[in-house]
From Swiss-Prot:
Entry keyword Translocase: no
Protein name: Protein-export protein SecB
Pfam families cross-referenced by the UniProt entry: SecB (PF02556)
GO CC terms in record: cytoplasm
SUPFAM superfamilies per UniProt: SecB-like
GO molecular function, one term: unfolded protein binding
Sequence intervals crossing the membrane: none
HAMAP family, A to Z: SecB (MF_00821)
UniProt record, GO biological process: protein folding; protein tetramerization; protein transport
Subcellular location: Cytoplasm
Length: 160
């Protein structure tokens, strides 16, 4: 009986584990260089979105993933506002092979962080007295696959 319990416990320890520990805003900025004059103009915005992720290994199977969303909104030729959020999370991830770990950090974790970053940006923009900013969902799996393909074409790099 004890041998069976020990075997089950060791199998549980070797099983893949994923746990969200914390989500937080790492950095936040908002600039409205043409206010208040921009508020008196006809509103015909064009939105530019830059998206970036990075990850850093912390101690004992903990990883920080940072999703950066940078939005530049122009009204005609003038910049109405620039907003940026770095939404971060600390994740406990263990017992994954290299490919699964890479996918988890590069696609799965950013997918968790995106709704928080989107809401933070929207709140920031409306506090700046601009119309709500409704960002469409992002397919991080597709972005991750594109990045892998680009890396392989550039240098034959593989995920480790």
């Amino acid at each position: 009986m004890t041998d069976q319990q020990n075997t089950a416990a060791s199998e549980d320890e070797a099983a893949p584990q994923f746990s969200l520990q914390r989500i937080y805003v790492r950095d936040l900025s908002f600039e409205a260089p043409k206010s208040p004059a921009i508020f008196r103009q006809q509103w015909e915005p064009s939105v530019g979105l830059d998206l970036n992720t990075r990850q850093k290994a912390l101690e004992d199977d903990f990883h920080e993933v940072v999703l950066t969303l940078s939005v530049t909104v122009k009204n005609g030729d003038e910049v109405a506002f620039i907003a940026e959020v770095q939404q971060a999370g600390i994740f406990l991830i263990r017992n994954l092979d290299a490919a699964s770990m890479s996918h988890t950090l590069g696609a799965f974790c950013p997918n968790i962080l995106f709704p928080y970053a989107r809401e933070t940006l929207d709140s920031l923009v409306t506090r700046g007295s601009f119309p709500a900013l409704m960002l469409a969902p992002v397919n991080f799996d597709a972005l991750y696959a594109q990045e892998l393909q680009r890396m392989q074409q550039e240098g034959g790099a593989t995920v480790q």
